[in-house]
């Protein structure tokens, strides 16, 4: 079981008022916030904290995924011809929604210049 603690007494002054997650089953402590010697998310053996007194603090531990060095993939499920037809016949595509800079927008609400720009940027002949 993981418990959250705030260190209230320690021979190491950098540990005073620091917050940790203690996993006694694994004998590990994860730093949440501390001064000086320890970094955020650093995992150390509980024994490395030395002689400390602490008070328990309520912790809501939810599993999280930490991704570093990931990649972004933009998937388009439209064909170029569909967007070109939407430019010529907007009445056929009143609900056509696209993503522009992370925002969802109705394709027909864009200006003709913006529509051409979306088509040009979205569909390229080569990489």
From Swiss-Prot:
Coiled coil: none annotated. PROSITE patterns: GLY_RADICAL_1, GLY_RADICAL_2. One of its GO terms (cellular component) is cytosol. Keywords: Organic radical. InterPro entries: Auton_GlycylRad_Cofactor, Form_AcTrfase_GR_CS, Gly_radical, Glycyl_radical_cofactor_GrcA. GO terms for molecular function: formate C-acetyltransferase activity. The modification Glycine radical is found at residue 102. Residues 5-127 form the Glycine radical domain. It comes from the Bacteria. NCBIfam families: spare_glycyl. Acts as a radical domain for damaged PFL and possibly other radical proteins. This is Autonomous glycyl radical cofactor.
């Amino acid at each position: 079981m993981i418990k959250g603690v705030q260190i209230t007494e320690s021979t190491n002054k950098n540990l005073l008022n620091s917050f940790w997650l203690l996993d006694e089953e694994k004998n590990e402590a994860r730093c949440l916030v501390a001064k000086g010697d320890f970094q955020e998310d650093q995992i150390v053996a509980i024994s490395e904290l030395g002689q400390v007194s602490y008070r328990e603090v309520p912790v809501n531990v939810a599993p999280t995924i930490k991704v570093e060095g990931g990649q972004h993939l933009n998937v388009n499920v439209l064909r170029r011809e569909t967007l070109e037809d939407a430019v010529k016949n907007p009445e056929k595509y009143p609900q056509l929604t696209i993503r522009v800079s992370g925002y969802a927008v109705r394709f027909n609400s864009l200006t003709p210049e913006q529509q051409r720009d979306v088509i040009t940027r979205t569909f390229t002949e080569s990489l």
